[in-house]
Amino acid sequence: MRSNLLLPEIIMLASFLMGLVGGQRAMTPLAAVAIAAARDELPADNGAPKLLSHPVVAAGALALAIGEMAGDKQKTAPDRIVAIGLAARFVTSAIAGASLVPRRQRWIGAAVGGLTAVAASYPGWRARMAAMSQYGQTPTGFVEDAVVLGGAAAIARNAAKLGAA
């Protein structure tokens, strides 16, 4: 039997993990929760903005995530730690973090998701730079994409289970 004392921490785990994803790809957390919202797969009484569940919003977020992943392989792609990149990671991961927790905890979930994304950007950037020097930009980008996509999908898919814990 699970203790109710740990329930808030378990629920915030999804926001934290999605923030880790957001530190690597800004648009993936938003796309993951928008798709989950459109499929009605988010936890009951979640903190997601209602507009997020609209199929057009989900499709748009997915298109932006795909565009970001394609652009990341370009030599001219900016580092994730530039100011606009950090701001985008904070905002999209905050929306995702709020969407993965009960409505009454949405502000905490937003803070956890957004702040984690900004913090995770730096070690993610350093790891990518180190890997790129050995393996190149495109191969390391594809590996990072696979990890990010798998993580985001697993988090969004299991958030409802965490909320029902």
Task: List each model region and its residues.
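Short amphipathic, positively biased membrane-proximal segments
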Residues: M1-A165
